């Protein structure tokens, strides 16, 4: 009701008033869950927000109202009063006129994206440092080649784009490609984002998009999407789900992260659905429906063991320096919130499975006597790697959704 087109301000004005900390592009720290990795996405064109960590979402008035415990009407009044003070509003309007949003391309069909990405990856090398990284994770050279992991190019981007055009590839609508100020096609690779590319494949093995596994994580984020949203002729990658293994398998496993899921597949032989993050459960549903139409009869959730994270305050957590309690309580508020967010996301997946009449169980490992995570083996890929290396790893335990989490 209050987020319509008749407003003379937008969500970026609200963000300015709230003094949210910007990390990159339209990503900010979340004031609701205390995230400091820039997981709150602001969508200026639609005047909406969504946190990929705590899943809070809504319009610009809800963003302000929820933080100040106001009604939408009260929030609207306060925002208007604040913007009418000083010259901020006039300066912001002038800036918007001078910097019009670049025209974006419509997302290209899957077959177009697949061919362009495949040709691009064929032209790229895999640096020794990245090859060693992948081998240390438990992959073989044959598997690395099969998945087409390649290093991010740091120069020659115009020439690479031209080579793809000469091969008959389409670049318009393919995330990561855009036109520079002269109209030449190029690619959104930057030196600060060096790393290796992780193709994200559909059920049928087509490359939908690519992620970059960063050499140097930024704000504790290890992955970035190869995207050109906000650039002339560019487009967003979205957050597609990676699928690897037999698409006709009766039992399918769900985890977080395409690289993790691919490693787990190669180490176990199981079929994996790999969401980009635990809160990306909305993207998981259409994949589950597609696999149900084949032969899938059961889902096994294998998210990281953070879902059983101990919440004791041990004064050893990486958030301790930011905690106002300074270890003066029995439980760590940051651990409690992190565990709540992950378990809530798991619950969303279980809810989707109930709606689809799809049996689902949960897989856990490396637990202590209280059933909490023992802190040694975090991911499903780590678990299978430990098993293969004949290290001490407890047998997996699968529990029904109805059991205590």
Locate each region found by the language model:
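N-terminal structured subdomain of primase-like DNA metabolism proteins
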Residues: 1-98, 155-156, 300, 327, ...
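Short, surface-exposed acidic
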Residues: 22-26, 70-79, 85-92, 138-149, ...
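TOPRIM fold recognition
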Residues: 1-7, 50-55, 249-252, 260-405
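Conserved active-site segments centered on acidic
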Residues: 73-133
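Terminal peptide-recognition signature
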Residues: 30, 51, 64, 134, ...
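Tandem CBS (Cystathionine beta-synthase) repeat/Bateman regulatory domains
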Residues: 124-166
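Phosphate-handling DNA/RNA-contact segment within nucleic-acid enzymes
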Residues: 159-295, 313
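Residue-level preference for well-ordered alpha-helical positions
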Residues: 65, 80, 135-136, 144, ...
